[in-house]
Amino acid sequence: MPAAPVLRPPPPPATPAPPAPSRPAPPIPGHRGPCDHSLKCLSSKISERKLPGPWLPAGRGPLEKPVLGPRGAVMPLFSPQSSLHSVRAEHSPLKPRVVTVVKLGGQPLRKATLLLNRRSVQTFEQLLSDISEALGFPRWKNDRVRKLFTLKGREVKSVSDFFREGDAFIAMGKEPLTLKSIQLAMEELYPKNRALALAPHSRVPSPRLRSRLPSKLLKGSHRCGEAGSYSAEMESKAVSRHQGKTSTVLAPEDKARAQKWVRGKQESEPGGPPSPGAATQEETHASGEKHLGVEIEKTSGEIVRCEKCKRERELQLGLQREPCPLGTSELDLGRAQKRDSEKLVRTKSCRRPSEAKSTDGEEGWKGDSHRGSPRDPPQELRRPNSNSDKKEIRGSESQDSHPQGAPKAQKDLVEGPPAVEEGPIDMRREDRHTCRSKHAAWLRREQQAEPPQLPRTRGEEKQAEHEKKPGGLGERRAPEKESKRKLEEKRPERPSGRKPRPKGIISADVEKHYDIGGVIGDGNFATVKECRHRETKQAYAMKMIDKSQLKGKEDIVDSEILIIQSLSHPNIVKLHEVYETEAEIYLIMEYVQGGDLFDAIVENVKFPEPEAAVMITDLCKALVHMHDKNIVHRDVKPENLLVQRNEDKSITLKLADFGLAKYVVRPIFTVCGTPTYVAPEILSEKGYGLEVDMWAAGVILYILLCGFPPFRSPERDQDELFNIIQVGQFEFLSPYWDNISDAAKDLVRNLLEVDPKKRYTAEQVLQHPWIEMVGHTNTGNSQKEESPNS
């Protein structure tokens, strides 16, 4: 009897060793794992996992920087048991990273590149502050960086989010992030990418692309950028890209449908036009509907009968097979279904050749070049890019001023407060023109919302018709015509209808009449130089405005010229002449040699009551003249008050800089000005008028008497400052106000009144006892000093 075999216990399963960081674990014999290829071949086999962004295209042209995945690194699709690391070492949070941040809101956009380390960043607030400083927006400015977004529109809310979200970010202030903002940021970051240039003009995907997308996505039940309940299905049908080629995993019904369409197409190609079966199948892909194309023909009531329509049908099918960038948003997919079905029905109708050429979208392109060279982009694709880019620039301006639902928006402008565009409210002197340049959009909107033009007399109509005749634009107007034209330009209802400035005058003509000297001031898009007339030797200030930096802000200069020409007062800077060339605009203005009041305050700190009374008197006289014409300055501050030193050693203030001035025909809701001098009704956004200038006059009077402003934030926090201003909380601190008269304090209280209806007007200030007593006393003393000299 044979011996029974000895039963040996099975060997215990080998405990898998922990994966070494530098080398992968050896593969198990007989098992084919994902790591049995060489590492050189492995890089070409890996498919990258990237969540689809809301619109980010994936064109053939390489980006200058790789747009990384949601965690800031390229993650191969390995199983969790694989010993290969899924995150590259160079994207480790511990290693310093170079990031690029784009700040939107101005032209040109601000872009900064920073080298950041995770260990050096303590808090997210510190990170935002550092980025804001690098972009040129200190933390006390109103348009500082408040939020960070990724290129996919996801908000960064913590330091850890920032260090795993990629290498490029979008910085925003209080304004919301829009799809247009993301597009502008992408064009700034990757200006040479062809896919970005084509993406805004190819939002409707081709039927071939639509057939690759999941059916649920085409129905519009899910969003493209969300990871919802269908994430497992999306992974099974994921679209993987490698070296510009697209491999797709289709559902069984979609694959059968595509194979049937390919067989029908191959059978129809030798004979000419595609077969009706193939055409109807293609229609099913294009429209994304369940019924067949034959049913579409029946419901449309039109049948393909002529050869011309067959050729157009073939042309349409050839266009539909063209690839489209994969960055089309899901909202556009939903809108494209109805539009594509309408195009198919319209293509079947028997049209004349002239009508066939007028089709829109892709039907307007020629299909022969598409079929002849499907891989190389034809010239017809490149040509619309330059034109469409120009249209896009104009469109962005029109979108700012005319959003969707234009009638309703215009009604809102008249009846209620519009959406406030945050503009910089700067208290530094070198940036005094920033607020004006940032608010060009709302200036245009408000000017467009002005009331209709007042009826003109017959004489004015004849004069206007005579000036519209050809040949009168390039000639010099007579002084009488100039005065009549200025009278017409005083009307607030015609800010953009001002007669054109003299044309055909080049820079040499300006230099022919004036000797141009050195620079005495500058702003965002203008430089002020001293000049002297060659014949009269009279000194003037020449404001030279660069038109290349003024694109989209022309109305600001036109409004400023219009208002200055309508004003004539000894306490207001006069405009002498206006010249315009192809490159620049020249404003020849009165030259005040004593500097501005800001310099005088820095030099003297504070002024005696008589001198302060004279300065406030000059300011209020100018404001009386302006307010009588319903013109509000909106930027009254020491920097805009020029000091003229007279021969009798007295001074005269002249109001200047009318870039924010505006005719008041209804309450204004635009937030603008300078923080220290801004009125509370501007901040409350409930509508304001002429009274805001008097609040600023009260702040200036307070500074003249004690040397510091009435409203201050110890931490220089602008939000805190605005809250203090809205409450109207100020006090006469001791010992600075101990020697100031009660009459002066009473005038300050009446000017710094929160209620605009109770606030003093300019005429009431001139009638105040302190002004009449102290101001006249100072004037009498100056006259007595002048009499012995004479």
Swiss-Prot record:
<dbReference type="GO" id="GO:0005524">
    <property type="term" value="F:ATP binding"/>
</dbReference>
<dbReference type="GO" id="GO:0035556">
    <property type="term" value="P:intracellular signal transduction"/>
</dbReference>
<keyword id="KW-0547">Nucleotide-binding</keyword>
<feature type="region of interest" description="Disordered">
    <location>
        <begin position="201"/>
        <end position="290"/>
    </location>
</feature>
<dbReference type="InterPro" id="IPR003533">
    <property type="entry name" value="Doublecortin_dom"/>
</dbReference>
<dbReference type="GO" id="GO:0005737">
    <property type="term" value="C:cytoplasm"/>
</dbReference>
<feature type="compositionally biased region" description="Basic and acidic residues">
    <location>
        <begin position="425"/>
        <end position="434"/>
    </location>
</feature>
<dbReference type="GO" id="GO:0034504">
    <property type="term" value="P:protein localization to nucleus"/>
</dbReference>
<keyword id="KW-0418">Kinase</keyword>
<feature type="compositionally biased region" description="Basic and acidic residues">
    <location>
        <begin position="332"/>
        <end position="345"/>
    </location>
</feature>
<dbReference type="InterPro" id="IPR011009">
    <property type="entry name" value="Kinase-like_dom_sf"/>
</dbReference>
<feature type="region of interest" description="Disordered">
    <location>
        <begin position="315"/>
        <end position="506"/>
    </location>
</feature>
<dbReference type="InterPro" id="IPR017441">
    <property type="entry name" value="Protein_kinase_ATP_BS"/>
</dbReference>
<keyword id="KW-0539">Nucleus</keyword>
<feature type="region of interest" description="Disordered">
    <location>
        <begin position="1"/>
        <end position="37"/>
    </location>
</feature>
<feature type="binding site">
    <location>
        <position position="543"/>
    </location>
    <ligand>
        <name>ATP</name>
    </ligand>
</feature>
<comment type="similarity">
    <text>Belongs to the protein kinase superfamily. CAMK Ser/Thr protein kinase family. CaMK subfamily.</text>
</comment>
<dbReference type="GO" id="GO:0004674">
    <property type="term" value="F:protein serine/threonine kinase activity"/>
</dbReference>
<keyword id="KW-0067">ATP-binding</keyword>
<dbReference type="GO" id="GO:0106310">
    <property type="term" value="F:protein serine kinase activity"/>
</dbReference>
<keyword id="KW-0963">Cytoplasm</keyword>
<feature type="binding site">
    <location>
        <begin position="520"/>
        <end position="528"/>
    </location>
    <ligand>
        <name>ATP</name>
    </ligand>
</feature>
<keyword id="KW-0808">Transferase</keyword>
<dbReference type="GO" id="GO:0004672">
    <property type="term" value="F:protein kinase activity"/>
</dbReference>
<dbReference type="InterPro" id="IPR000719">
    <property type="entry name" value="Prot_kinase_dom"/>
</dbReference>
<dbReference type="Pfam" id="PF03607">
    <property type="entry name" value="DCX"/>
</dbReference>
<feature type="compositionally biased region" description="Basic and acidic residues">
    <location>
        <begin position="457"/>
        <end position="496"/>
    </location>
</feature>
<dbReference type="InterPro" id="IPR036572">
    <property type="entry name" value="Doublecortin_dom_sf"/>
</dbReference>
<keyword id="KW-0723">Serine/threonine-protein kinase</keyword>
<feature type="compositionally biased region" description="Low complexity">
    <location>
        <begin position="201"/>
        <end position="218"/>
    </location>
</feature>
<dbReference type="Pfam" id="PF00069">
    <property type="entry name" value="Pkinase"/>
</dbReference>
<feature type="domain" description="Doublecortin">
    <location>
        <begin position="97"/>
        <end position="183"/>
    </location>
</feature>
<feature type="active site" description="Proton acceptor">
    <location>
        <position position="635"/>
    </location>
</feature>
<dbReference type="GO" id="GO:1900181">
    <property type="term" value="P:negative regulation of protein localization to nucleus"/>
</dbReference>
<dbReference type="GO" id="GO:0005634">
    <property type="term" value="C:nucleus"/>
</dbReference>
<feature type="compositionally biased region" description="Pro residues">
    <location>
        <begin position="7"/>
        <end position="29"/>
    </location>
</feature>
<feature type="compositionally biased region" description="Basic and acidic residues">
    <location>
        <begin position="352"/>
        <end position="400"/>
    </location>
</feature>
<protein>
    <recommendedName>
        <fullName>Serine/threonine-protein kinase DCLK3</fullName>
        <ecNumber>2.7.11.1</ecNumber>
    </recommendedName>
</protein>
<feature type="domain" description="Protein kinase">
    <location>
        <begin position="514"/>
        <end position="771"/>
    </location>
</feature>
<dbReference type="InterPro" id="IPR008271">
    <property type="entry name" value="Ser/Thr_kinase_AS"/>
</dbReference>
